[in-house]
């Protein structure tokens, strides 16, 4: 891993991340937002974490299979997530932003803060050090946090999964998922300039409209105003 330089915030490309518990509907909402952005003639890239690039996808498979628990627990998982993020940011996200694309990412460092930090008991010093090495001062332009009651989210995830075995995180006890929801709500409250908390316990189209309003007010309209004044 190498030290990252800050992303040039004046680029037309924007970085939007989606966070939330299991079954919150992140994948669906990313797809719907991508369609709207493309309709607005904005080049869009959809990706995910862990994963998104070939190296990160290989690490994803190991993580979801539970390798972190086998080789050292939460600290080991945090290191693996950092390695995946380093590859993902360096080979996919940064080049896309440099091309002026809008990048929509299913999970980013807030998930590490929630899963491995608050709930996995990884020290804040370690997480901050890993974040500085992997992304430096880079931050999403907007983080959409989808909030849904835990029982409803897990039921949705079970329907989506079908007969497949629950992954490493889906199989955690319900108290884990309740704690996860609370951590994401805390992040939204602590960083309102970056985060928007969206009630995801509604029809997908209604949730998509709420997200679009946030994107329009926070990113699209300021960008257009800046272009006119330039």
Curated annotation (Swiss-Prot):
GO biological process: dTDP biosynthetic process; dTTP biosynthetic process; dUDP biosynthetic process
EC number: 2.7.4.9
Catalysed reaction, written as an equation: dTMP + ATP = dTDP + ADP
Superkingdom of this protein's organism: Bacteria
Any one cellular-component term (Gene Ontology): cytosol
Record Pfam families: Thymidylate_kin (PF02223)
Family: Belongs to the thymidylate kinase family.
NCBIfam families, per the entry: DTMP_kinase
Identification of the protein by name: Thymidylate kinase
Origin species: Rhodopseudomonas palustris (strain ATCC BAA-98 / CGA009)
């Amino acid at each position: 891993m190498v030290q990252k330089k800050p992303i040039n915030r004046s680029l037309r490309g924007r970085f939007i991340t989606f966070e939330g518990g299991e079954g919150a509907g992140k994948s669906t909402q990313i797809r719907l937002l991508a369609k709207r952005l493309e309709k607005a003639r904005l080049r869009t890239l959809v990706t995910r974490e862990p994963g998104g690039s070939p190296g990160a996808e290989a690490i994803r498979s190991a993580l979801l299979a539970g390798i972190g628990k086998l080789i050292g627990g939460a600290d080991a998982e945090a290191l693996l997530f950092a390695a995946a993020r380093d590859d993902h940011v360096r080979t996919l996200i940064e080049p896309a932003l440099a091309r002026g694309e809008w990048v929509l990412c299913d999970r980013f460092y807030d998930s590490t803060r929630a899963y491995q930090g608050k709930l996995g008991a990884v020290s804040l010093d370690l997480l901050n050090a890993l974040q500085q090495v992997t992304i430096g001062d880079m931050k999403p332009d907007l983080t959409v946090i989808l909030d849904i009651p835990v029982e409803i989210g897990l039921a949705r995830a079970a329907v989506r999964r079908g007969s497949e075995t629950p992954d490493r995180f889906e199989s955690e006890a319900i108290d884990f998922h309740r704690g996860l929801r609370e951590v994401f709500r805390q992040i939204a409250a602590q960083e309102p300039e970056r985060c928007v908390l969206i009630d995801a316990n509604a029809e997908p189209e209604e949730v998509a409209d709420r997200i679009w309003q946030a994107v329009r007010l926070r990113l699209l309209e300021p960008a257009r105003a800046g272009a006119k004044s330039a």
